[in-house]
């Protein structure tokens, strides 16, 4: 097929971008294999298998009455709640259509052609995609034990570097950086380099392992802390995340964001979710038990895996394409990660106990051929 006539007129850096590959939807697999959607187990996208709290469901139902009206562009109530929870001024908070939005807003505000952004090998693939979209150059630093090599990343920072991305815990490998090492790295960076600390999986850490990253913003005005309601809070479908940063940085991001980037239902859901800390802690404990179940099962199968601090585990299965195809045929969805430079590995989300059992049974069959 001939390319559309307009394609040659798009910038080279746009045409060079590889599209983001999302986890396969349940409905898509059901269509492909003629399966009953209710029998499919999806462990591909690091979603909370419990879903949102009952209070969140009620808040969303109540907010439906506001559908004819535009959302509050400044999300007053949600920002106020986050301000109280995090002990920061509301002017330091930027809301996003998922935390992806925060990452992209940083690149929109601070990157242009000729600039560089630094990130680790095997880190979240949105970092290079968002960098490429601005015509900037991504500098991928080789991983160390599947995680961030902070010394090498610091050495990769040059006069052209405008942004550095760090994920803690890292996706898709699940590695974690101790707070002391993380702060030392942030403190070593030039103050004119924006460092984005992506904490999408922060709530899955044992509380004593969580970095006081929001407090660091006062010391490091070039720090942006990004978090999401998509994971532990169970709001993936509603797309709401937030960033905490110096007010001057927040002002720039608010200048380039869409005016209604977080919808009314998402704002209501996030506000209710934030108020239910017990539900999030219960989700963390369930995840810990599920992780132990998966790790034990992988050990029985003799599979190598990367110890994870998130709600997922990366397992080396050999011919990942063939194993994944077998899992799909059995109605189990996991995440191939060849596009992360890990062609022999699959990322498996921690599910409910019965979902984990289903995965391990299907994986056993897939490995036996």
PLM-predicted stretches and their roles:
Residues 2-98, 105:
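N-terminal small-domain helix-loop-helix segment of the aminotransferase-like
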Residues 288, 297-330, 346:
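Conserved PLP-binding catalytic core of the aspartate aminotransferase-like
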Residues 326-330, 335, 339-369:
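PLP-dependent enzyme catalytic core of the Aspartate aminotransferase-like
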């Amino acid at each position: 097929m001939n390319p559309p006539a307009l394609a040659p007129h798009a910038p080279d850096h746009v045409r060079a971008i590889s599209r983001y590959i999302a986890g396969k939807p349940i409905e898509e697999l059901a269509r492909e294999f003629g399966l009953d959607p209710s029998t499919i187990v999806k462990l591909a996208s690091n979603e909370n298998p419990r879903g949102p709290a009952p209070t969140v469901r009620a808040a969303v139902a109540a907010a439906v009455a506001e559908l004819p009206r535009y959302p509050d562009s400044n999300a007053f109530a949600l920002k106020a709640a986050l301000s109280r929870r995090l002990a920061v001024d509301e002017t330091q908070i930027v809301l996003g259509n998922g935390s992806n939005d925060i990452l992209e807003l940083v690149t929109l505000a601070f990157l242009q052609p000729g600039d560089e952004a630094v990130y680790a090998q095997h880190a979240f693939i949105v970092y290079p995609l968002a960098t490429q979209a601005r015509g900037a150059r991504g500098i991928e630093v080789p991983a160390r034990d599947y995680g961030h090599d902070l010394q090498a990343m610091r050495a990769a920072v040059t006069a052209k570097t405008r942004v550095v991305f760090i994920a803690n815990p890292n996706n898709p490998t699940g590695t974690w950086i101790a707070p002391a090492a993380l702060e030392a790295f942030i403190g070593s960076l030039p103050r004119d380099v924006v460092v984005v600390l992506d904490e999408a999986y922060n709530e899955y850490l044992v509380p004593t392992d969580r970095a006081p990253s929001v407090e660091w913003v006062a010391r490091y005005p070039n720090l942006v802390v990004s978090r999401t309601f998509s994971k532990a809070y169970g709001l993936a479908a509603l797309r709401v995340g937030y960033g905490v940063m110096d007010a001057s940085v927040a002002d720039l991001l608010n200048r380039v964001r869409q005016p209604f980037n977080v919808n009314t239902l998402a704002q209501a859901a996030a506000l209710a979710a934030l108020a239910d800390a017990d539900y999030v802690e219960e989700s963390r404990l369930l995840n810990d038990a599920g992780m132990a179940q998966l790790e034990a099962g992988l050990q029985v199968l003799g599979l190598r895996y990367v110890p994870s601090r998130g709600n997922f585990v990366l397992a080396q299965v050999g011919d990942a394409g063939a194993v994944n195809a077998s899992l799909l045929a059995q109605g189990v969805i996991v995440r191939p990660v060849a596009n992360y430079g890990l062609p022999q590995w699959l990322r498996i989300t921690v599910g409910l106990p019965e979902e984990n059992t289903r995965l391990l049974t299907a994986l056993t069959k897939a490995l036996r051929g």
